[in-house]
Amino acid sequence: MATQIIDDTPKTKGKKSGIGDILKPLNSEYGKVAPGWGTTPLMGIMMALFAVFLVVILELYNSSVLLDGVSVSW
């Protein structure tokens, strides 16, 4: 029994649309990675600030143990 090779590439091109033309530049850098750390330190700082924000919200809502030494006087 012989092996049959089937070409599964599409025979027709996709339909061109206005939205596709608008979104195409957003995908032009696909697969490219900038060398170095990039914005990783900035992301770390933002995550730390968000964690502090969550702890403050938790303290105000639940009188958390995390900030037990900090007095809140309203």
From Swiss-Prot:
GO MF term set: phosphate ion binding
Keyword Transmembrane helix: yes
One biological process term in Gene Ontology: protein stabilization
Record PTM text: Phosphorylation is a light-dependent reaction catalyzed by a membrane-bound kinase; phosphorylation occurs on Thr residue(s) in the N-terminus of the protein.
Membrane topology (UniProt): Single-pass membrane protein
One Pfam family recorded for the sequence: PsbH
Major subcellular site: plastid
Signal sequence interval, chain numbering: none
Modification sites for Phosphothreonine: T3
Protein name: Photosystem II reaction center protein H
Species: Marchantia polymorpha (Common liverwort)
Keywords assigned: Chloroplast, Membrane, Phosphoprotein, Photosynthesis, Photosystem II, Plastid, Thylakoid, Transmembrane, Transmembrane helix
Family statement drawn from the similarity comment of this UniProt entry: Belongs to the PsbH family.
Subcellular location: Plastid, Chloroplast thylakoid membrane
Keyword Hydrolase attached: no
Gene name for this UniProt entry: psbH
Function noted in UniProt: One of the components of the core complex of photosystem II (PSII), required for its stability and/or assembly. PSII is a light-driven water:plastoquinone oxidoreductase that uses light energy to abstract electrons from H(2)O, generating O(2) and a proton gradient subsequently used for ATP formation. It consists of a core antenna complex that captures photons, and an electron transfer chain that converts photonic excitation into a charge separation.
